[in-house]
Amino acid sequence: MTPRRTVLLALRLALCAPLPARAQEPRRPREVPGRDFRPEGVWRRQARAVRATRARLLAQRQFAALNAPLATGVPIPSAAAVSGTLRVPAVLFTYAGTPAPTFASTAYDAVLFGATPPFGRPYTYHSFYSQLSNGLLDVQGATYGWVRLSQPEASYNGGTSSACQQENPFGSTNCNGIWSGAAFGALQAGLRQALALVDAQVDFSQFSYDPGSGVVSLVLFMQPALGGECGPSSGPENHLWAHRGALFPGYMTQDPWPGHAGKFLQVQDYVLQSGLGGSNSCTGTDIMPIGTVAHETGHGFGLPDLYDTSDSTAGVGRWSLMGAGNFSSPSSPSRMDAWSLSQLGWVTLVPLATSGTYSFGAAPTSDTAFLVRPTGANPRGEYFLLENRQAVDADSALIRNACQVWYQAATPPGCSGGLLAWHVDSQQVAQHGFESGNAVNAGPIHGLELLQADARGNLDANPNIPCTPPAAGCGDRGDVGDPYPGVTQNPTLALFTTPNTALNSGACPGVGIDSITQVVPNGALRFVLRLGGDSLAVATAPRLVAAQWGYSYSLTLAAACGTGSYSWAGPDSGAAPPGLTVSPTGVLSGAPTDTGTFTFRVSVTDGTQTARRTLTLHVVEPTLTMQQVLDLGFLGPAPAGDDRRRYLDLQGNANGTFDIGDVARWLARTGNGAAPGATARTAGRRP
């Protein structure tokens, strides 16, 4: 047998070998891209007018008018806040041949619209939004059903197909009523049938609707099985996947459209979710949580997703209902972040324009967020929002879960909330907001970025890259290292700290915060604000985005508080990863030829000023599947170009050419198969 055939046989035998484990916080795909309410759906028209009013008042610095809805302690309807009563019908449906659902419709009335939460829960859909809005929004409704559709479940979920497998985040062939056009059509046919079955019982004119279009604001649908988003865990669970959407064409009800003779109200915008789920959203014996419908209702007010819709980071993670906070504790979702609340007029926004000492209470009780603007040029409209998040009200579950750090067996000592410092980039929000692609926190600049006190940047790390926790570069959805001073007791945020107050525009922020102190446990915070006085600095965070062994890498270093005529040099101490260099224009690029953690210092000069900063770059080993290696070595051209070949050569015989010896070495090193005659070359390389 030839050496080539020997290695080929070893490769094929190794196909069944396990892949290397990845140390990352477990993730589950949830939201369905491309499915949405109409542009004018739910209360988006009203919310758009509120945002325009608030933007004008903010630009004019008319804070008394901006904060008028909450100024007296009693909610006051105003053009500067989303307010009123949102009346929502909920329709429960099941399928032909399906056993009777576990919970009666009265249980759903209690979970969604009750004043007193049932089942020992802290909130209903109604009470959660009442507290979140400080009484400005009253969610009311009624539940109808269960009604039984005429066909089995398989008639409405779209069955299975290879087309659905290409779209399904689990890689399953399940269509879940959503992963192909045909499946979505089948699902919507089921929703229309459910509406027809309850139409005689429901007077849709008693629920919220747009008087200008005759469209009911929102309808909730509940189906009897666990949601498809819970995954095909032990078998083919081809159930409908929770999502928001709109019926096209809309369903014409039997109820007249008031003021429009001969015309009738329509149903278009809806939220579909499972009627089951419990505290983790996927427990089949417990009634549904409220996290999904609470999150989707936020979209009904025009708020964007604040997780990273490109799946390259966690975005804001669990720290906001519009991030992953709806799943932090689905029975008690996280509050909205200060920026989202300010968009709706549900928080008092206090500007800080002078240096000094300030204090404020926990967010749910103080209803206050501080606004801090840069002191100099600000072409992107950047600013900072400060809020005090403690284990109070809805944030109790948030802080408890954040304290259960995913990479530790026990809760850290002194675990509590603290000050959250948000960096807002208005240009990013305007160009990539909910009505412009819903990509606020996708890409190199995030519209709303949480400056994480522990300097690990877990929210900003790519969750798809392997790492060893709790190091920087390990992705999670937020932990108690993020607030100030937090478990790391970090009292300072400034241009020279990690993280820092650097602006995305490169302009000088002139903002520093120090002496951040928790005055009362789960209560008041105090800090000192210092405005102005910044000099030339390297603005790039010291812990760089992780690189991969042999893969192309490029990162542009940033400076601030200079004229912009920057000249870069380095390293002048330590050593960058071999294969990477710093250009005079500040680009760190190349392809690392080794793994490890590398610490080195760079400098930037602007006229007579020079600033230096020590940087750390972690180079990790890529994770390749056996099929990817087969594709590279034997089954045709490599889909990913030269990066994978370069990596395999470096970990192999490092002779500058990708060959069978490299594949043999990879097999031996990773345990995916024995490679006869392979010679290990491990000196200076990750074992």
What are these regions (language model features)?
Residues 129, 217-408, 427:
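Extracellular hydrolytic enzyme modules, especially secreted metalloproteases
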Residues 576-593, 647-648:
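Strand-loop-strand motifs at the edges of beta-sheets in extracellular beta-sandwich domains
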Residues 534-542:
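Proline-enriched interdomain boundary motifs that mark the N-terminal boundary
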Residues 560-564, 574, 607:
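Short glycine/proline-centered coil/turn motifs in the loop regions
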Residues 69-80, 127-263:
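Active-site-proximal segments of metallohydrolase catalytic domains
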Residues 362-533:
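Extracellular low-complexity, Gly/Ser/Thr-rich intrinsically disordered linkers
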Residues 616-687:
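Cellulosome-associated attachment modules in secreted, modular CAZymes
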